[in-house]
């Protein structure tokens, strides 16, 4: 690589538009030094990702097997890529056998792909196809420098271009040679007075003969190219011999068309013809048979497509039927659950009605209790106490000492409850001081018991929410003493919640 100077800051070696080597150098071969990592058979790659993956897999497998890299010399030419093992020469050994040192050799047209690893630019590889087995083989190499690997890859790519140009030149030269030969044959044929065919007729006849040979399709495996070249060689020989052979072929059968006579001219033996195609079979019939065969193949393919679509529709119908059955099973399960819930609800309604009938039978007023009343009602009617009612044990009144001495509240008494829904209010009318002895003789005190009234909906009229109730209940137990003075034991609460009792 030329060194960069002050006026040469651009490296043309990395420019893909500029060729690396002269095209004449590929005739002799361009040599590179590298290290051979290894080779493995790979399936036909479809993308660069698969190629890079195969390259890395080969590297890791050979590294795991502890196989050392070999120093090789890579020769790139128009003949192909040749890999030769590089060894030091011994002093006594003047020459060596190149076949023993040859590692591999692949022609250019069999090389499938050449590239380097994007992660490690020193690693490059090419994939070649084996001519005998058509197996793709990946060969991995490693160079000393990244630039060297890039030059090798670009050199192999340039060898493709050079071979393509050479093939185009060869085809053009062959075409020119054929045109020159035809012009010479035309000039020779025009000088022969006994010749009946002109040059244009010969060209059309040759075209018809070649078409007829292709239409015959001789069933000889592997000899299609040889048969075609042999026919062309016979045609050239006929043109060189002159018109005597053609006249001798055409004159015994003056009424026979040219197309039926041409296979006899080109094909040496009649045994190579198919048994179904005779000399009198017209060419159009054969083409019609080919057309019918192609139409039949097309119909078969369409039938296969239709069958595949039918199978797909059947699968879709089966999936939809399974989904529908599953949905029906779920709906049936939901219906059963709904039925059980309805039965349970009807049972609850019957129980509620029985409770209402029992309560209405005990009620003297005949009022109908609501569901909320039945829910909150217990066996012993609870008592609701206000926060302002003083507690009985904290009262210090000498007037009530004798009256309360013989009064004891049982455990189930409404007066022994704190969390209750009955409101007791006591009020007393204190007589003058001169009448206090009369009260001590056993006159009853005046008190009041007020029950909370319920609406038909079951909601209390005085306390609208449960939160207020709970707050007031807490305040009853923590605030002032209750105002309950005395309730006689012989008096009982009413049966109905709508009644007010005054004692």
Swiss-Prot record:
It comes from Mus musculus (Mouse). Residues 491-503 are annotated as: Interaction with NOS1. InterPro entries: Adapter_Engulfment-Domain, PH-like_dom_sf, PTB/PI_dom. Its main location: other. PROSITE patterns: PID (PS01179). Residues 26-191 form the PID domain. Keywords: Cell junction, Cell projection, Coiled coil, Phosphoprotein. Adapter protein involved in neuronal nitric-oxide (NO) synthesis regulation via its association with nNOS/NOS1. The complex formed with NOS1 and synapsins is necessary for specific NO and synapsin functions at a presynaptic level. Mediates an indirect interaction between NOS1 and RASD1 leading to enhance the ability of NOS1 to activate RASD1. Competes with DLG4 for interaction with NOS1, possibly affecting NOS1 activity by regulating the interaction between NOS1 and DLG4. In kidney podocytes, plays a role in podosomes and filopodia formation through CDC42 activation. One of its GO terms (cellular component) is podosome. The modification Phosphoserine is found at residues 183, 187, 190, 262, 367, 370, 397, 413. Pfam families: PID (PF00640). Residues 318-359 form a coiled coil. The lineage of its organism: Eukaryota, Metazoa, Chordata, Craniata, Vertebrata. A motif (PDZ-binding) lies at residues 501-503. This is Carboxyl-terminal PDZ ligand of neuronal nitric oxide synthase protein. GO terms for molecular function: nitric-oxide synthase binding.
């Amino acid at each position: 690589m030329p060194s960069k100077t002050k006026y040469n800051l651009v490296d043309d070696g990395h420019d893909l538009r500029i060729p690396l080597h002269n095209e004449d150098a590929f005739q002799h071969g361009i040599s590179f030094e590298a290290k051979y990592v290894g080779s493995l058979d790979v399936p036909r790659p479809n993308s660069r990702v698969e190629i890079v993956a195969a390259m890395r897999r080969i590297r890791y497998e050979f590294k795991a097997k502890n196989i050392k890299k070999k120093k090789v010399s890579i020769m790139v030419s128009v003949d192909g890529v040749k890999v030769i093992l590089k060894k030091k020469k011994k002093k006594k050994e003047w020459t060596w056998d190149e076949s023993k040192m040859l590692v591999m050799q692949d022609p250019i047209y069999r090389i499938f792909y050449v590239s380097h690893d994007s992660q490690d630019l020193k690693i490059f590889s090419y994939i070649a196809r084996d001519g005998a087995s058509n197996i793709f083989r990946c060969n991995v190499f490693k160079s000393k420098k990244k630039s060297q690997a890039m030059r090798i890859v670009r050199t192999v790519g340039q060898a493709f271009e050079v071979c393509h140009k050479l093939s185009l030149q060869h085809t053009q030269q062959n075409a020119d040679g054929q045109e020159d030969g035809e012009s010479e044959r035309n000039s020779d044929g025009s000088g022969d007075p006994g010749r009946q065919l002109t040059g244009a007729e010969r060209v059309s006849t040759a075209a018809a003969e070649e078409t007829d040979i292709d239409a015959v399709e001789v069933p000889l495996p592997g000899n299609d190219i040889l048969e075609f070249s042999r026919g062309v060689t016979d045609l050239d020989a006929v043109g060189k011999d002159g018109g005597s052979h053609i006249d001798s072929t055409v004159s015994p059968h003056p009424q026979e068309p040219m197309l039926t006579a041409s296979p006899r001219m080109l094909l040496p033996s009649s045994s190579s013809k198919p048994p179904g195609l005779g000399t009198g079979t017209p060419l159009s019939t054969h083409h019609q048979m080919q057309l019918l065969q192609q139409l039949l193949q097309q119909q078969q393919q369409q039938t296969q497509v239709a069958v595949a679509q039918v199978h797909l529709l059947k699968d879709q119908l089966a999936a939809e039927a399974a989904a529908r059955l599953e949905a029906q099973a779920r709906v049936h399960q939901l219906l059963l659950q709904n039925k059980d819930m309805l039965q349970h609800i009807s049972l609850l309604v019957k129980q509620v009605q029985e409770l209402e009938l029992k309560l209405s039978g005990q009620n003297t007023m005949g009022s109908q209790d609501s569901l909320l009343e039945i829910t909150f009602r217990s066996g012993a009617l609870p008592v609701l106490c206000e926060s302002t009612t003083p507690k009985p044990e904290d009262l210090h009144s000498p007037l009530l000492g004798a009256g309360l001495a013989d009064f004891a509240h049982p455990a189930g008494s409404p007066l022994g409850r704190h969390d209750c829904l009955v409101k007791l209010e006591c009020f007393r009318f204190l007589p003058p001081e001169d009448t206090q002895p009369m009260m001590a003789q056993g006159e009853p005190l005046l008190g009041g018991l007020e029950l909370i009234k319920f609406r038909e909906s079951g909601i209390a009229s005085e306390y609208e929410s449960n939160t207020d109730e709970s707050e007031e209940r807490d305040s009853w137990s923590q605030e002032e003493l209750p105002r309950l003075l005395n309730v006689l034991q012989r008096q009982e609460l009413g049966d109905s919640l709508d009644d007010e009792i005054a004692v």
